[in-house]
Design a protein with these regions (language model features):
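Extended substrate/RNA-proximal surfaces in nucleic-acid metabolism proteins
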Residues: 2-3, 61-208
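Conserved, well-ordered active-site substructure
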Residues: 258-264
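An N-terminally biased module of ancient metal coordination in phosphate/nucleic-acid-related enzymes
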Residues: 1-80, 162-169, 181-196, 200-255
Length: 264
């Protein structure tokens, strides 16, 4: 899967989220939006779930767009969250079992976070959060929306800055694999493993260490990465002979599908 060779330049987006995790639009809606943008190939990469893939494939079949079944796996390394994208994933028993454990852990984590907010005098319930989580995955943006809804913060950014961001009073760790385990899991499910948004790791030494694992590629182009960043990651990809990919990391109307600074 040498992505940049098989895809017509500028007509793809390999990092998209739907309501199956923390996106605002259903898989069908995301596929239709991508088609309207003139994209020909997209990857659905929800956090720790494959739940949106089937719906996306069915919609894509009707409108003639190619779907790469994907995932964004949560892993942890040296205290940092490292997201690993998996492409051309098949739902194996092993993968389903790990994802089920991660889902249960997220649900328990959600209850712990709710409890922390309540202790700070901000009463929110699981029901408040489930209004925003349309899939099986409950993620922090869903909790943040419920907090804003109750009038405890002006917007979701404020919720993250004050309460939910890493190290903040209501933060709780999610279940995260090691990068090596995540990469192996993707490989055993027939997939290709790619390091997501390296800039967001905020440590190029760690990025280089990750390139020395059995990972297949790196997300050179991402909406938060400048041209300068992309050049740096391109050099790294060449140095370690890794595949180069790109995606918008689309979640909601604040982001543009297909816009991630890719230059052929």
């Amino acid at each position: 899967l040498e992505i940049l060779k098989i895809i017509e330049n500028g007509r793809f987006d390999l990092h998209l989220h739907t309501t199956a995790s923390d996106g605002s639009f259903s898989p069908s809606e995301v596929v239709k939006m991508a088609a309207q943008k003139g994209l020909t190939t997209i990857a659905i990469t929800d956090h720790d779930t494959l739940d949106g893939i089937q719906e996306a494939i069915e919609t894509a079949r009707k409108i003639g767009i190619t779907i790469i079944p994907g995932i964004e796996l949560s892993t942890k390394y040296k205290g940092k969250t490292i997201d690993i994208l998996g492409y051309n994933i098949h739902e194996t028993k092993e993968l389903s079992s790990v994802l089920q454990k991660m889902r249960k852990h997220r649900q328990n984590r959600c209850l712990l976070i709710v409890n922390k907010f309540c202790k700070l005098g901000m009463t929110i319930t699981l029901e408040d959060i489930q209004k925003y989580s349309k899939g099986n995955v409950i993620a922090r943006p869903h909790i943040a929306k419920a907090v804003v809804d109750k009038g405890y913060a002006k917007d979701t950014q404020e919720v993250f800055d004050l309460y939910l961001g890493d190290g903040k009073p209501c933060a709780e760790d999610k279940m995260e694999l090691s990068p090596s385990s995540g990469i192996e899991l993707i490989h055993r499910a027939g997939g290709v493993a790619v390091l997501a948004h390296p800039l967001l790791i905020h440590d190029d030494i760690i990025v280089e260490e990750l390139m020395q694992l059995a990972i297949d590629g790196i997300e050179v182009w991402h909406r938060k990465q400048s041209e300068e960043d992309s050049k740096r990651y391109k050099s790294l990809a060449k140095k370690y002979r890794k595949m180069m990919t790109g995606g918008s990391d689309f979640h909601n109307e604040e982001h543009e599908i297909g816009e991630f600074g890719f230059e052929s």
